[in-house]
């Protein structure tokens, strides 16, 4: 269904375009869309060594960044191209990542934009809310013992 390939610094531009396409609707809904800010935030947090491209039939379908953070893992970026959404790809990718985390016995933490579709997606996959601030909600998933 999909395969991961390693990202490089050369992937920055196409991944920031993917980020903007994926988040635009949610950001516009709350009056927070600013293309330049979205680009700058991604530039400040893009770590190619922790980023995997999600490829479907040889084409970029998304990306995910998962790396060590405190005593667990931080899922910092997870974007599925709008044309690929609604087909189970996001769930398949997340389930693979959670299996990797479970094999290591590590929790996975993340933050999502308030009122985005991502909130429901992560709750459906066993994440529980751990905190919130003005625009973001924080979640954690823990492996079963």
Positions of PLM-derived features:
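Conserved GNAT acetyl-CoA-binding A-motif
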Residues: 72, 101-114
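Conserved GNAT-fold acetyl-CoA-binding loop/helix
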Residues: 17-43
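Conserved beta-strand in the GNAT
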Residues: 59-67, 74-79
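Conserved acetyl-CoA-binding loop-helix of GNAT-fold acetyltransferases
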Residues: 80, 86-99, 123-124
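Conserved beta-strand-loop-alpha-helix junction that forms the acyl-donor binding cleft
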Residues: 85, 109-120, 132-143
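A short beta-loop-alpha structural element at the N-terminal edge
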Residues: 3-17
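Conserved active-site tyrosine of GNAT-family acetyltransferases
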Residues: 42, 122, 127
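A short helix-loop-beta-strand connector motif used in the catalytic cores of GNAT acetyltransferases and
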Residues: 43-53, 62
């Amino acid at each position: 269904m999909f395969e991961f390939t390693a990202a490089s610094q050369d992937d920055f531009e196409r991944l920031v375009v993917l980020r903007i396409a994926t988040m635009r609707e949610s950001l516009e809904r709350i009056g927070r869309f600013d293309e330049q800010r979205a680009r700058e935030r991604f530039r400040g947090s893009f770590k190619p060594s922790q980023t995997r491209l999600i490829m479907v039939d040889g084409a970029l379908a998304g990306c995910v960044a998962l790396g060590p953070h405190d005593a667990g893992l931080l899922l910092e970026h997870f974007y599925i191209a709008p044309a690929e959404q609604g087909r189970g790809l996001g769930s398949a990718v997340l389930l693979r990542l959670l299996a990797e985390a479970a094999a290591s016995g590590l929790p996975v933490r993340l933050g999502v934009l308030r009122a985005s579709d991502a909130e429901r997606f992560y709750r459906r996959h066993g994440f529980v809310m751990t905190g919130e601030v003005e625009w973001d909600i924080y979640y954690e998933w823990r492996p079963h013992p």
